[in-house]
Amino acid sequence: MKTIEGKVLNGFGKLVGSGIVLDDDGVLVELCPVSDDIHGWITPGLIDIHCHGGGGASFPDDPNDAGIETAIRTHQKCGTSGMLASLVSMVDPVPAIEALVPWCEKGELLGIHLEGPYISPHKCGAQNPAAVRNPDMEELRAWLEAGRGWIRTMTIAPEVENAQEAAELLLEFGAVPSWGHTSALGAQALERLRATAESGSARSFGRPAQTATHLFNAMPPLAHREPGPVREFIQAARRGECVVELVADAVHLHPDLVSDVTEYVGASPAGELGVVFVTDAMAGAGMADGDYELGGLPVTIVDGVARLTEGGAIAGGTARLSDEIKRMVTCGATTMEQAVRACVAAPAAALGIDSSACGVTIEWTVGERPSFIHFTDELDVAEVWREGETIR
């Protein structure tokens, strides 16, 4: 038997115990009753639904077993027990999709995220503009079929031609559109949000069937005469019609903004799970400063910030989700409970992932092998367990 003490939170951020007891096979035997004077935290393993890589490898640039495993392990050992593999705008993503599917099938990945290529050429960010184009339904269907049900979401600009048709096709395959990399006016974003929320396919999901890709980044800023898509995404999340991603690393977004959005959206019962923290991590996550690559574009990391070597646009993140929790909670932007909810229950709900998926623990269930993190009082990662096995 092994007892680990700490304030135990479930995936919704609710305090449910003061420690856990595991048997020799990593099976949960009991939750210790809530009590005072307990140090540290125990949370379910984190879920990252927007991650391009780490450890020197990326899913779009290294679609081979060695590269894929390196990226996965870099995040797993820091407590991300479930993750999507995010691609970028590519001329032909099929080889990368086909390389990732086996890793989904054996439970190392929760699915695949296509970030592009159906995005605004004016808001490429760190995407390759040569690969950006308007949606083609025959092409998209071929990608979805290659994904064998593992493509869970795709970033599309709401204003591009055939955006709604692409969204409907994604929903038909059980994937959700993620609006982003956009130059849309607020009215255009609202039209797409409403059309998707009211579609028959979306209604059958029983949950918000759309997300917003890294809110604020790669989209027009909130302005006093044209609020743009940012306001519409936030309001839709508060209504329970959308889920917004925040790259809560204190680089992509100021912590005060993370706090404001989390509080505003979460203040509505419909928006309780409306905010998701993501890393948008690239190959340099968990690595030293230096030169890397994202989607074939050179990237330079200086002081932990990744930027395109030419042009200087932010080119993904270098944090892991456990880093984001520490940064946001330590500076007071969120509570521990809010941060855990945004890293566990909210991402799982956004994509319809439940506790039967490998690496996913939402509630602590006696008799099951949990995936979890043991944090110190300072929110450093002390231990990581996945499916009842210690990996750190």
Regions found by a protein language model. Give the residues of each.
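Active-site-adjacent C-terminal substructures of enzyme catalytic domains
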Residues: 187-194, 199-343, 350-354, 375-379
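N-terminal helical capping/dimerization or prosegment-like subdomains
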Residues: 13-31
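Generic structural signal for well-ordered alpha-helices
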Residues: 71-72, 94-101, 140, 144, ...
